[in-house]
Amino acid sequence: MKRLATLFVLALLALLAGCSGLRVVDSQVLAVASAPPGVQLQGARYRFERLPSQVGNPEAGLAEQQAEQALAAVGLVRDDAGAQLSVLVGLQGTQYLADPWGSPYPGTYGSISIGRGVPWGTGVGFGMGMRFPPPTQYRREVSLILRDLRSGQVVYETHASHDGPWSDSKTIFATLFKAALANFPNPPAGPQRVNIEIPR
C-alpha cells in the first residue's frame, strides 16, 4: 500500500512539473480573405504602411517587428522596394481590475436578502464581498490589414484578442500576431478560438 501511494505521489508530481512549464494563450480571432483572382497571398512580398498617428511611435516599430516574424512564419517576405502588398499593423492593450468572474471590476458590491424560515421565523441579512486587492487583467488586441498595392484593395484582414492575467505584453503580443495568422491564407468563416502554448 505504501508503495502504491509513493507511485501515485510521484506521478502527480511529474504531472504538475510538466504543466508548470507552459501556459496557454487563448485568442479570439476573426480573419477575412478577399483576394481577387490573380492576387497570390502565399509567398507575397510586402512592406509596412503606417498611419500618420503611428509615424515616430516606438510601439509601432515594436509591433512591426513582431508582425514581421509572424508574417515570415506563414511565408510572406518583407521587401520594401519590390512589395506587392502593404501591411498595416494595429496594436492595443489595456489593463483593468477584475471581479471574481473576470469582468471589469465595478467597485464594491454586496447583497441584501430577506427570507422566511420554514416553518417558522423570518430574517434579514446583509452581505458584502470583495477580494483585496482585485486581480489585474490585461486585454490585448492586434490587427493586420493586407492591401494589394496595384488596386488598393484589402485582400486579407485579421484581428486577434486575448484577456488574461499575464503582464508580459511583449510575449503576449507576439503570440497574438501568430494567432491572427492561423490558417493563413484561407481562414474559416466567422470567429475562431486559437490556443497557443508558450513558456511561463
Name each model-derived stretch.
Residues 44-100:
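N-terminal segment of the mature soluble domain
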Residues 49-51, 90, 115, 147, ...:
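A structural detector for beta-sheet-dominated domains
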Residues 37-45:
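Immediate post-signal peptide segment of exported/extracytoplasmic ligand-binding proteins
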Residues 19-37, 132-200:
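C-terminal/domain-edge helix-coil "capping" segments
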Residues 63, 101-105, 158:
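"Short basic amphipathic alpha-helical interaction patches in structured regions
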Residues 89-151:
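Surface-exposed short loop/turn segments
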Residues 10, 39, 78, 128, ...:
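Sterically constrained small-residue positions within well-ordered secondary structures
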Residues 1-19:
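Sec-dependent bacterial lipoprotein signal peptides
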